[in-house]
Amino acid sequence: MASNLGSSNYRYQVGGSLPVNAPTYISRAADKLLYQSLLVGEYCYVLNSRQMGKSSLRIQTMNRLRSAGIVCAEIELSGIGSQQITPQQWYGGLIQELVSGFDLDIDLLAWLCDHAHLSPVKCLGEFISTVLLEQIQQRIVIFIDEIDSTLSLSFPADDFFALIRNCYEQRANKPQFRRLTFVLLGVATPSNLIQNKASAIPFNIGQAIDLEGFKLSECAPLIAGLTGFSPHPQAIIEEVLYWTRGRPFLTQKLCRMVANQLQKRSDLDVSVDEEKQLVKTLVKTQIIDHWESQDEPEHLRTIRDRLLYSEQSRALLLLYQQILAGKQLLANNELTQFELRLTGLVSKVGGELVVANPIYHNIFNQAWVDQQLSVQPSPAESVYRTSGVSDLWDRLIEDSN
């Protein structure tokens, strides 16, 4: 969904990946870090909550790398499938994506038949070594998006991640592997992605890329979209960022709402306070009030569902409750903290966990948390329900009647 401002056709895009030439794309510190890391051949991973701009970052970075003479391709794992798919089909799908993405000249069916004696992961490794790196002599970057879809596979993806690490380790003895770099993107914790914790994983050899909210100094493209419709475009964006803390989806959405209102206005003789009040009113009436019915495209419900349908939902709620109450909690790599951050509900600021923005604070407030905890089973009840004791007790009661 997009909003057009007058004849300039300026677009605030809400949801989805922004194209390369999108006028409202905001370049952040992550853009620079990812690009520079890939230029020197570092493996990278971008693990963050949904709608933080991962896919748009990938598109922009691929464009810059191609301009620098680096050959790139992306694999969206969700497109290969994860439900009722065998290892042979999944790894075969990866190979097919490489053939398509790099436009490789190969009779793939014949090649797969010739290598049918290999395990699926070994087959992929052999393809990378003898086909991809042979046909493409330039530097190569493979972006693997939606890496969290591996969690839905009926088989462990440990071998896949071990293969990626092995490609890195082969740089020591095989110079051609120094031309190959991977980028992993998705919504998951490294520990969740790996079932065998003793496995060699790529996350401790790569560069982590953190996606932070937009800062005012980065927002010239957003300000430009309001110029001509308000005498105070920067003040409006400042107020937008106060409410969204620069979260990409919410920021683009609120900018679109403001733009639509400004287009209806004929009088430009307004004060800064009036412009800020307009933003505040839109936040209250079109985002916070009746939020579940107004949440289109879906954003807030995604946060809610990731929090409530997690296996450790109660632990996440209790941790969030402490943050909501203002307790100082130092951010660390503990699993519950990482899971809570992946909901998008909290972020790391100055080394501490805080509620990500005032919109979330108003919607997912203390009353909401109390309500959710009241219907969550206690730890003892969870054990009782999952241990089979409950069913046995119910049958004994039924038999005695």
Per-segment meaning from a language model:
Residues A2-R28, D107-A110, I201-N204, L300, ...:
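Conserved adenine-nucleotide phosphate-binding loops and their immediately adjacent elements
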Residues S217-T343, V349-G350:
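Winged-helix-like regulatory helical subdomains adjacent to P-loop NTPase cores
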Residues K174, T189-G206:
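Short regulatory helix/loop adjacent to the ATP-binding pocket of P-loop NTPases
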Residues A2-S49, K54-L65, T130-V131, N401:
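Walker A/P-loop-proximal flanking segment of P-loop NTPase domains
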Residues Y360-Y384:
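Short, amphipathic alpha-helical interaction segments positioned at domain boundaries
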Residues C72, Q84-L108:
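Conserved NTP-binding/hydrolysis module of P-loop NTPases
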Residues S100-D158, L163-R165, E169-T181:
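Mid-core helix/loop region of P-loop NTP-binding domains shared across ATPases and GTPases
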Residues N63-Q83, I142:
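Conserved catalytic segments around the Walker B and adjacent sensor/switch elements
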